[in-house]
UniProtKB/Swiss-Prot annotation:
Visual pigments are the light-absorbing molecules that mediate vision. They consist of an apoprotein, opsin, covalently linked to cis-retinal. Belongs to the G-protein coupled receptor 1 family. Opsin subfamily. Pfam families: 7tm_1 (PF00001), Rhodopsin_N (PF10413). Its main location: membrane. Disulfide bonds join 110-187. GO terms for biological process: phototransduction; visual perception. This is Blue-sensitive opsin P467. Gene3D superfamilies: Rhodopsin 7-helix transmembrane proteins.
Amino acid sequence: MNGTEGINFYVPLSNKTGLVRSPFEYPQYYLADPWKFKVLSFYMFFLIAAGMPLNGLTLFVTFQHKKLRQPLNYILVNLAAANLVTVCCGFTVTFYASWYAYFVFGPIGCAIEGFFATIGGQVALWSLVVLAIERYIVICKPMGNFRFSATHAIMGIAFTWFMALACAGPPLFGWSRFIPEGMQCSCGPDYYTLNPDFHNESYVIYMFIVHFTVPMVVIFFSYGRLVCKVREAAAQQQESATTQKAEKEVTRMVILMVLGFLLAWTPYAATAIWIFTNRGAAFSVTFMTIPAFFSKSSSIYNPIIYVLLNKQFRNCMVTTICCGKNPFGDEDVSSSVSQSKTEVSSVSSSQVAPA
């Protein structure tokens, strides 16, 4: 084996030289130069400094402006809430571990960090599934003129958290475990060992099928059908030009959110699959460190995409930041809502094709 397995950890370095030390007790400077750990800590500080205000402001603006409290926006608020929890409860632990180059908080801290990182990623993924299904049902109309109500949105939110807990919870109760990965400063499920006490293999298979492959299939199927429907409607002029543009704008926003998720998480998933299918193979510590830390950037993608592409939300945010005034001359947000082609919530509650 080209790595060293210990109690609650696996270091991708053979201990023939006697250098390997527990990542819960000693700095891991034998794995990488000290400056590399500092780079990771500064990167985590950036994500915390950006993620807290972006997601916090998203929640605050939504609760402050009644016009934003529409069914489809519930799912987007759910994303922001999950990101904020992950930043506060997970990223802060990762930052501290990176600064000291080992998990100061021990196996419990590792489990906490791994749990919240998994929760954040899974809530984001299943929220995108809910949005994809909503887009498919409302635009493709397999159920007729469907109205996406508050009840549907709340059920969707409950579903995202149930599925996220179904993925992040088992390692806390003995089905697999969370262990340090890469440079031993962030934690994730155990893809590395075949420890029979934790049944890692069955958990990893379950996770990749139920919590990655299935949602990806649903998302791609929904948007594949959606794109065909939008093109068909445009060709036949079934809807007004305003409605068609609204459909395209809202759909573009959600598709960009999906692409942002894939950009952040696909490298990590691909690396984890390779490690899982090539247990014992040699790989450098940076091989898992880079995708593991890069995946955490997803916590700041969605608020940025939402602000850039949702005119109503953007106006409300500017008004909130500027204490009730919009210096860009678009102060009458309520009137702009009725005219905006990119506004998500009003489109989502209509009985026409856009959500």
